Amino acid sequence: MNFTVGFKPLLGDAHSMDNLEKQLICPICLEMFSKPVVILPCQHNLCRKCANDVFQASNPLWQSRSSTTVSSGGRFRCPSCRHEVVLDRHGVYGLQRNLLVENIIDIYKQESSRPLHSKAEQHLMCEEHEDEKINIYCLSCEVPTCSLCKVFGAHKDCEVAPLPTIYKRQKSELSDGIAMLVAGNDRVQAVITQMEEVCQTIEENSRRQKQLLNQRFEGLCAVLEERKGELLQALAREQEEKLQRVRGLIRQYGDHLEASSKLVESAIQSMEEPQMALYLQQAKELINKVGTMSKVELAGRPEPGYERMDQFTVSVEHVAEMLRTIDFQPGTSGEEEDEEVAVEGEEGNAGPEEERTDGRESTGQH
């Protein structure tokens, strides 16, 4: 069935156009949305310029970069539902554009520019029966047709229905489809908003965990530095004690050597005395001194291996291996780890005291 196209478009009647226009009015400027149109997290729409004006009014201390650009950050309330809108660093330019509303505005303006009276005069005319209007719908072939085609034409054996009935039915179906599409777009926009919030949460949680990780390793480094200092001090004390002992022995041996050398020198000079009487006057005393000096017992020398310091060797291989096994613990938050570390610290502090107590009790029993 061929026919001449001349039917009214979906938005052709004035009542539908008026209803649609009401849905396209901005709640701020009370005029039709001007591009770009932004959608808020609460799913209401605003002209971006109007959103900028609302933001400026709600944040008087924030200055615009220019007449049309708002500073990043800040917040304001939706004029329709009073829901608080939090802006990111892009300001109102970070809000999503509602391309669906912008497209509907374009369609509305195109339809509004067409004369309604000329559209009302157009009709579908049957090409096989030129004087017959298309007034019925063939349900079997799913095409509009005329009454003559049903009576003795190509659709005489088909099931038909009044054209207005099918028109209302399919218009209702299309309207429902549009509503579902719009609702689906709203849901998609809501999901996008949620996922953007998830991205922000991921970034924030990652930043916090990085900070905690740095703190943990800085704490480990501090413990290692503290322990290294303690061990170095112990090594230095042992070194000083041994050096003092050995140097004391050196001084003692040196004093004995000096006294012995002087006595030897005196004895040699006495032996060179040619007069026997003078020699004998000094000989007895020198003989006694030499005998006494030879019997002096000096302090013992350091025992073999006294100079060794290998008892201060530290084995860190097992600690290094343990450090290499440090890994993340899924499901454990930073706060829980802090509590665990605090509990372990308290138990560690109590341990030595308990050991000392046990030691005293054991000593008492023996």
From Swiss-Prot:
Pfam families cross-referenced by the UniProt entry: zf-B_box (PF00643), zf-RING_UBOX (PF13445)
Zinc is among the record's keywords: yes
An annotated Gene Ontology molecular function: zinc ion binding
SUPFAM superfamilies according to UniProt: B-box zinc-binding domain, RING/U-box
Compositional bias (Acidic residues): 334-347
Keywords from the named record: Coiled coil, Cytoplasm, Cytoskeleton, Developmental protein, Differentiation, Metal-binding, Microtubule, Zinc, Zinc-finger
Biased amino acid composition, Basic and acidic residues: 353-366
Record's GO cellular component terms: cytoplasm; microtubule; Z disc
Main subcellular localisation: cytoplasm
Quaternary data: Homooligomer and heterooligomer. Interacts with TRIM63 and probably with TRIM55. Interacts with tubulin.
Function: May bind and stabilize microtubules during myotubes formation.
Protein's name according to its UniProt entry: Tripartite motif-containing protein 54
Native source species: Bos taurus (Bovine)
Underlying gene: TRIM54
